[in-house]
């Protein structure tokens, strides 16, 4: 019997959790690892799809007893709608539960080269990302756990030959023959034909490895860019500088957006990602927002790209600031280092002064006339997400006197002088454009 060569090395001093269905693939992997004296904890799932599933349980359980292996059994009652995806998620959860119990991060499954081919063809038929088109990886991480596929580059035929040579007991799952599932159609109709025409499985392995190399290079460039151009300041947490982003190749831009979504466990379609990239690169739409899910929006403004939770208050609008007014500027230094001077004539300012948020019809006064605050903010390139959260200083007649870092009314005369400062006011030189 030709030796089996695993896709990844396993250590004899480490414990591994292995999912075993009772089929030929998982029973062959279990047999091989037992022979290699790998420490194992076996997990078997009963999907309750037919009355004969107890036979698989007894087969796996007896094999574990004969080889002094830990055996863990779960019954999964999944809804028929989207059955396969729901079952996969439940299996992952239970496997991680057992791994945590035995204090090991390693979880093994018996996916093989034919499985890889099926997955790649499925991804091509449905569209995917570059990583998705590569099908499966030998190693993937999920929270604190590492899923390994030691048989990933071994053809199914070789596994069957191995099982026959060592007389390994196994049971076939009849659902693998049902052509109602696309995967089974690919398995029984498409792949057998392709195998007769080319060295299909060997080419699948080369294809997967080529895509993974390209993906790894692109992701490396993505991480380098984010390390250099991600803003971690309190007013723009985890925002990405827009200008250098626009200079990137489109494939890197797309991977950056994909990574942002991955970090929030957000899945979106290829077309949706394309629309985001198109919008970010549109110079005529400086303020855009994309609804990703109930918790997150992706925001583009004049200078940044960022994920934002619409349910959370913006950092610069947490609390209403306290306005401090004095005729002595030194008296306000301890309140705020940013002190504004306001000159005025008594007939042009009506006290007391107040602080309020921006309103739709607000108008600013200049020496040349008036201008709508909305237009002024657009010209100053104030991000849309910040415009409705601006604190304004107004007099008792609601005339706008001062907007921190943006505007001071210079049409009030020079008879008197006062100094203004905000206590508990969020300030940052990066908040707004400083153009005149």
UniProtKB/Swiss-Prot annotation:
It comes from the Bacteria. GO terms for cellular component: cytoplasm. It holds the Pfam family ATP_bind_3. It catalyses: cytidine(34) in tRNA(Ile2) + L-lysine + ATP = lysidine(34) in tRNA(Ile2) + AMP + diphosphate + H(+). It is found in: Cytoplasm. Keywords: ATP-binding, Cytoplasm, Ligase, Nucleotide-binding, tRNA processing. InterPro entries: Lysidine-tRNA-synth_C, Rossmann-like_a/b/a_fold, TilS/TtcA_N, tRNA_Ile_lys_synt, tRNA_Ile_lys_synt_N. PANTHER family: TRNA(ILE)-LYSIDINE SYNTHASE-RELATED. This is tRNA(Ile)-lysidine synthase. It comes from Aster yellows witches'-broom phytoplasma (strain AYWB). The gene is tilS.
């Amino acid at each position: 019997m030709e030796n089996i060569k695993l896709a990844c090395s396993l250590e004899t001093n480490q414990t591994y959790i292995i999912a075993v269905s009772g089929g030929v693939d998982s029973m062959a992997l279990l047999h091989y690892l037992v022979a290699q004296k790998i420490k194992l904890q076996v997990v078997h799932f009963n999907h309750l799809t037919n009355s004969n599933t107890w036979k698989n349980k007894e087969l796996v359980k007896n094999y574990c007893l004969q080889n002094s292996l830990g055996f863990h059994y779960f019954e999964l009652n999944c809804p028929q709608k989207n059955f396969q995806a729901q079952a996969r998620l439940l299996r992952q959860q239970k496997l991680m539960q057992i791994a945590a119990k035995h204090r090991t991060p390693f979880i093994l499954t018996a996916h093989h080269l034919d499985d890889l081919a099926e997955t790649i063809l499925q991804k091509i038929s449905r569209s995917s990302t570059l990583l998705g088109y590569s099908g499966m990886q030998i190693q993937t991480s999920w929270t604190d756990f590492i899923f390994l596929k030691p048989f990933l580059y071994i053809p199914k035929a070789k596994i069957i030959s191995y099982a026959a040579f060592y007389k390994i007991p196994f049971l076939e799952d009849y659902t693998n023959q049902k052509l109602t599932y696309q995967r089974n159609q690919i398995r029984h109709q498409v792949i057998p034909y392709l195998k007769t025409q080319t060295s299909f499985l060997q080419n699948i392995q080369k294809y997967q490895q080529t895509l993974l190399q390209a993906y790894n290079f692109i992701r490396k460039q993505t991480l380098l860019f984010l390390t250099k151009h991600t803003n971690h300041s309190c007013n723009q947490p985890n925002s990405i500088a827009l200008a250098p982003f626009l200079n990137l190749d489109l494939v890197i831009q797309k991977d950056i957006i994909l990574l942002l979504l991955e970090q929030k466990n957000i899945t979106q379609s290829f077309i949706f990602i394309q629309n985001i990239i198109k919008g970010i690169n549109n110079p005529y739409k400086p303020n855009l927002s994309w609804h990703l899910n109930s918790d997150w929006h992706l925001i583009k403004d004049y200078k940044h790209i960022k994920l934002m939770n619409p349910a959370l208050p913006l950092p610069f609008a947490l609390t209403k600031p306290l306005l401090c007014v004095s005729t002595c500027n030194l008296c306000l230094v301890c309140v705020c280092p940013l002190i504004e001077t306001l000159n005025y004539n008594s007939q042009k300012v009506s006290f007391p002064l107040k602080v309020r948020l921006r309103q739709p019809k607000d108008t600013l006064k200049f020496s040349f006339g008036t201008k709508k605050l909305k237009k002024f903010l657009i010209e100053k390139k104030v991000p849309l997400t910040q415009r409705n959260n601006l604190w304004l200083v107004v007099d008792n007649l609601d005339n706008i006197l001062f907007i921190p870092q943006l505007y001071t009314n210079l049409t009030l005369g020079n008879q008197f002088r006062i100094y203004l400062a905000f206590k508990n006011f969020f300030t940052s030189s990066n908040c707004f454009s400083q153009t005149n």
